[in-house]
Structures are given as C-alpha cells and as structure tokens.
Amino acid sequence: MSSGGLFLLLGLLTLWEVLTPVSSKDRPKFCELPADSGSCKGNFQAFYYHPVHRTCLEFIYGGCEGNDNNFKTIDECKRTCAT
C-alpha cells in the first residue's frame, strides 16, 4: 500500500473514532441527570446532556454545587454523553 493510501486509511479510522457515538451502555450514569444550576447566583454558560432529546443543550450554571451533568463546552458534553 502506498504512503498516500496509508494516510487515507489512518484518516478514515480517526474520523470513524471521532464520529462513532457513545453507546448508551458506555454513557456515564450522570448523563441522565437533569440540568442543575446549583445554589449559587452566578451566571455561567454551561451545557448538559438531555437524554430525551439525545443532545447537549445550554443552561445557566450558578457556579457551585449542581451535578456532574455540567460541561464548560458543548464539545465536551457531546464527547462524554451524546449518542
């Protein structure tokens, strides 16, 4: 196989790994928790996984407490929880 073919194969395998969804059996249990802004009064953009819609959505996090279904970026949420 030529070096171009190897690079293509490596690229396709990498793309497959990135785009393959997290299966529900591999998804952490905290991904099923509801969005929880916590008890503090801050105003921070955060993201949580919504299991019914099977996507990550934005919410406002107060800055303390809450639960583990709380991500700083939508990409982090998707990598961890999205199917």
Swiss-Prot record:
This is Kunitz serine protease inhibitor Pr-mulgin 3. GO terms for cellular component: extracellular region. Belongs to the venom Kunitz-type family. GO terms for molecular function: serine-type endopeptidase inhibitor activity; toxin activity. Residues 31-81 form the BPTI/Kunitz inhibitor domain. InterPro entries: Kunitz_BPTI, Kunitz_BPTI_sf, Prtase_inh_Kunz-CS, TFPI/VKTCI-like. Negative results: does not inhibit serine proteases (chymotrypsin, elastase, kallikrein, and pepsin), cysteine protease (cathepsin G), and MMP (1, 3, 7, 8, 9, 10, 12, 13, and 14), as well as voltage-gated potassium channels (Shaker and rKv1.1/KCNA1). It comes from the Eukaryota. Transmembrane segments: none annotated. It is found in: Secreted. Expressed by the venom gland. Serine protease inhibitor that acts against trypsin (EC(50)=10 nM, Ki=5nM), and plasmin (EC(50)=200 nM, Ki=100 nM). Disulfide bonds join C31-C81, C40-C64, C56-C77. The keyword Glycoprotein does not apply. It comes from Pseudechis rossignolii. The keyword Disulfide bond applies. The record marks K41, G42 as: Reactive bond for trypsin. Keywords: Disulfide bond, Protease inhibitor, Secreted, Serine protease inhibitor, Signal, Toxin. Residues 1-24 form the signal peptide. Its main location: secreted. It holds the Pfam family Kunitz_BPTI.
